[in-house]
């Protein structure tokens, strides 16, 4: 049924609430899991007379990317030990657009994610990223509500 499942993660425990569910799906359907992280850091834009330490900026970005890769590799290694095929996919830019683009590029049959909403209106119930994905996604979407995860 599901051969490729895209799993957006932001490193938070709330986002990780989806992990047991996709692990179960991967084992049941022998699906390939793609762990997605979208880097939202804006590009470096300077005013005409502004001075910035470019090397420090690039080093900070490199360290953040390395931290993200280490985080995702840890999850991938745990799953590989269980016989689950998993890879990472890194995007940069707005989160919703990154999820949509990655789902298309990876030909995901399913996007599985945890909502981060806190209650209130529709956007607050789901979270703004989840609401954006719901509006734009062109394939099945599995949502797990993670409001009780700290």
Over which residues does each language-model region extend?
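A short acidic, glycine-rich active-site loop
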Residues: 54-70
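Glycine-rich, Arg-bearing micro-motifs that act as flexible, cationic patches
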Residues: 110-135, 150
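Short, hinge-like loop/turn segments at secondary-structure boundaries
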Residues: 50-54, 105-106, 129-130
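Short, structured motif recognition centered on aromatic/hydrophobic residues
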Residues: 6-7, 25, 33-35, 71, ...
